[in-house]
């Protein structure tokens, strides 16, 4: 539960993201910023319910899902980011965005259109090319 009447979790208390990438502090601050907006709006509406105070999490989760997917790929020994980038160099900018925490925009997860099938191939879930 991320929020309740009169309280809300932010930062690592809301959702820890593996520190393998240096963007963890940014995500903690971003969650605080989004939660602060929900709190200010709650005061303006005289609504400090858990629903109002947690309204920021949908946007946050939509962005951080891409980092969680990237971390999952990182810890899969069979997957090689180097080999993936050689095959799909057009994703270099997207990978850079993910690594620096630029994830709150449409298209942030475009790399996974190719990365997910590549992962499935190395794990033998689908035939190799």
What are these regions (language model features)?
Residues 1-66:
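Conserved mid-domain beta->alpha element of the FAD-binding
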Residues 40-129:
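C-terminal helical "tail/cap" subdomain of flavin- and related membrane-associated enzymes
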